[in-house]
């Protein structure tokens, strides 16, 4: 991997406020490859730590589905420590990740490319790319994706180095972990309330967030606080 290209990416995305680093890196990646959307996720020793940022709603759906269902290209990439490149989910995905693939296709996601962020055996996170259309990454696009993954790894390490004294995680990373827990709890509650599976429960949560033009985490907090309830064979009522 060209260290010159990685340094160039870091120089470009770090020319701004620290809090916006993850967003700038993902947006730059989506333009450079190009792909429809990009997501950056945190990994912890216990597993998926949560989504740090995504470039768009479909990328957020992809991240949330894999976190909730515990399956998908991104989960495999983190577990195995190597990229997982799925150029046509409809052809290859159903046999490996049936629940994730069915929901991803419904959301318009046709191809997924997942890159682990790690230092040696230590898992830090994932850089996840997706397209609305099928097709592989060409040689140049793959090299770009690997460069952005290396840059994202460096960025996460620098954020951790700047965490407040006495805190285990930088605030941006701690926020991802907290959001992950609340979304997971809300999804579990909806499975009971609406008598549906995990995948459908997450889609109900996302549909409500979309229709009400609110962040997913805010809707999840309402479910956990019992301000919002989903009824069987019905949309929802508050």
Set out the residue ranges of the language-model regions:
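Intrinsically disordered, low-complexity terminal regulatory regions
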Residues: 1-69, 221-238
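Interdomain signal-transducing alpha-helical coiled-coil linkers
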Residues: 3-6, 15, 138-142, 157-170, ...
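Regulatory sensory and allosteric helical modules in signal-transduction proteins
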Residues: 43, 59-96, 102-110
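Short beta-strand-to-loop transition segments that serve as allosteric relay/switch motifs
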Residues: 89, 126-135, 140
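Short hydrophobic beta-strand micro-motif common in sensory/regulatory domains
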Residues: 111-118
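Allosteric cytosolic regulatory segments
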Residues: 142-153
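Signal-transducing coiled-coil/dimerization helices and immediately adjacent hinge/linker segments
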Residues: 161-238
């Amino acid at each position: 991997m060209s260290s010159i290209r990685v340094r160039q990416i870091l120089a470009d995305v770090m020319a701004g406020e620290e809090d916006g680093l993850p967003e700038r890196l993902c947006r730059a990646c989506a333009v450079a490859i190009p792909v429809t959307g990009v997501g950056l996720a945190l990994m912890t020793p216990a597993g998926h730590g949560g989504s740090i940022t995504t470039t768009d709603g479909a990328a957020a759906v992809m991240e949330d589905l894999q976190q909730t269902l515990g399956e998908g290209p991104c989960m495999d990439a983190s577990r195995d420590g190597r990229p997982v490149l799925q150029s046509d989910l409809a052809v290859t995905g159903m046999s490996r990740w049936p629940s994730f693939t069915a929901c991803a296709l419904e959301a318009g996601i046709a191809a997924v490319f997942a890159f682990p962020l790690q230092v040696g055996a230590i898992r830090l996170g994932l850089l996840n790319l997706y397209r609305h259309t099928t097709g592989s990454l060409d040689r140049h696009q793959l090299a770009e994706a690997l460069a952005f993954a290396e840059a994202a790894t460096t960025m996460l390490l620098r954020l951790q180095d700047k965490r407040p004294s006495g805190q285990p995680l930088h605030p941006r990373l701690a926020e991802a972990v907290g959001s992950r827990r609340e979304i997971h709890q809300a999804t579990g509650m909806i499975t009971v309330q609406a008598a549906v599976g995990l995948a459908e429960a997450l889609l109900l949560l996302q549909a409500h967030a979309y229709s009400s033009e609110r962040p997913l985490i805010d809707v999840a907090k309402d479910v956990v606080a019992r301000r919002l309830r989903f009824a069987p064979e019905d949309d929802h009522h508050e």
